[in-house]
A protein has these predicted regions:
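Catalytic-loop region of hydrolases
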Residues: 2-60, 74
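N-terminal cap/lid subdomain of alpha/beta-hydrolase-fold enzymes
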Residues: 45, 49-118
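Conserved acidic catalytic loop of the alpha/beta-hydrolase fold
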Residues: 122-124, 128, 135-155
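Conserved hydrolase catalytic core segment
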Residues: 152-191
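Alpha/beta-hydrolase-fold enzymes
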Residues: 176, 182-282
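Short alpha-helix in the alpha/beta-hydrolase fold that links the catalytic acid
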Residues: 307-312, 322, 335-345
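Short beta-strand/loop motif that positions the catalytic acidic residue
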Residues: 325-327
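Catalytic active-site module of serine/aspartate enzymes centered on a nucleophile-bearing elbow/loop
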Residues: 341-344, 349-385
């Protein structure tokens, strides 16, 4: 490892989450599958004002790839990843609620992760980072929330992997959550999702620059991360959308050597190829490979049924008053049947549940790109509280 790595790893991702506050929440943190962290830092951002009795708290857990910058703020005017959902007079109204978005444990945007410095070794954790689970994420978030002096969450919001964390949080810390919004998520990973993520991890590990996780931060395995992102994109969106959006359109100006299968090509032949490349290159430059591996595997491992012998029994441990469960028909990564199962389980737990199947062509990413239909449902839910 190069001598510059120690200093570089501390700052390399900060430019992607400059508005986050990083708080030390524990001197040590035991992980569910063994091992411990020698210090636990959590990154978060807030919007709105906390009322006097602290009864207006909304907490948002993110999916795998976003930072805590969910919306623009006075500190950072850059639009957030859910800017159309969160803000004054928006579905999650920062004029009424104190909104906290937490960067997930294991992510490279401020919270303790494989890129963090292990104080005992003065080196980045890298793959010496203990095995990470969704439950670890939930427990770390709970420590942060307690550190902020908050005992009760008015509404807990979780899309995708964030929904898994929200479910775990509601079971493990069941006196802390009043209401919940779960979007395009599940109580466990299905074979298709596990297969896709296993391939993503494999291409990262097969990148020669990965070096069994001890790569130089000056020469990270960008190619592996780039291809992994492309694989992910094929599961995040729907084939129906891509037929309408791209069809068989070809790019302009591409010089194609057919016998080299793209080795010397100056561009991609089809627009869909160019689109995937554009999205993947953006991602490879902002996300750490080891963090991706840990977060991806945590999703595969998650099974809420482990907390009650069955999903129904696990959900019966929650104390949620009202819940909103949303999904879309075109989601292949978290099929709509999985949201229906959450609805049925929470209903048996005597939670007042609203379940909606929304029509969107954008697949799993619908909640990020087709936000108008989601915003309507989320706003109606908040208005009902």
């Amino acid at each position: 490892m190069k001598n510059s790595d120690n200093k570089k790893v501390i700052t390399m991702f900060k430019h992607n989450n400059t508005s986050a506050t990083i708080m030390s929440v524990a001197d040590s943190f035991d992980m569910r599958r063994g091992g411990k962290l020698n210090e636990l830092d959590m990154a978060y951002e807030t919007w709105g004002k906390l009322n006097q009795n602290k009864s207006n708290v909304v907490v948002v857990f993110t999916g795998l790839s976003p930072s805590s910058h969910i919306a623009s703020s006075e500190k950072d005017k850059t639009p957030g990843w859910w800017d159309s959902m969160v803000g004054s007079n928006k579905a999650i109204d920062t004029g009424k609620y104190f909104v906290i978005c937490i960067n997930t444990l294991g992510s490279c945007f401020g919270s303790t992760s494989p890129v963090s410095i292990n104080k005992k070794t003065s080196m980045p954790y890298r793959v010496s980072f203990p095995a990470l689970t969704i439950e670890d994420m939930a427990n770390a978030s709970h420590l942060l929330i307690k550190k902020l002096g908050i005992n009760k969450i008015k509404v807990l919001v979780g899309p995708s992997m964030g929904g898994m964390q929200a479910l775990a949080y509601s079971v493990l810390h069941n006196k802390s959550v009043e209401n919940i919004i779960l979007i395009s998520t599940a109580t466990q990973a299905l074979p298709f999702a596990i297969a896709v993520r296993s391939l993503q991890r494999e291409v990262i590990r097969k990148d020669p620059l990965w070096k069994t996780g001890f790569y130089s931060y000056e020469e990270p395995p960008l190619n592996g991360v780039r291809i992994a992102r492309k694989l992910g994109m094929t599961s995040y969106r729907s084939s129906v959308e891509w037929i309408q959006r791209f069809g068989r359109k070809k790019t302009t100006g591409a010089i194609i050597n057919q016998n080299l299968f793209g080795i010397d090509n100056t561009n991609f032949e089809y627009e869909i190829e160019s689109y995937l490349e554009h999205q993947a290159v953006k991602f490879q430059n902002i996300f750490d490979a080891n963090c991706y591996l840990y977060l991806s595997r945590a999703m595969d491992w998650f099974d809420l049924a482990e907390h009650g012998d069955s999903t129904i029994n696990a959900l019966s441990k929650t104390n949620i008053k009202k819940a909103l469960v949303l999904g879309v028909k075109t989601d292949t990564l978290f099929p709509i049947q999985q949201q229906k199962e959450i609805f049925e389980g929470l209903s048996q737990a005597e939670t007042q549940v609203t379940f909606k199947t929304l029509n969107s062509l954008q697949g799993h990413d619908s909640f990020l790109v087709d936000t108008e239909i989601f915003s309507t449902e989320v706003k109606d839910f908040f208005d009902s509280l």
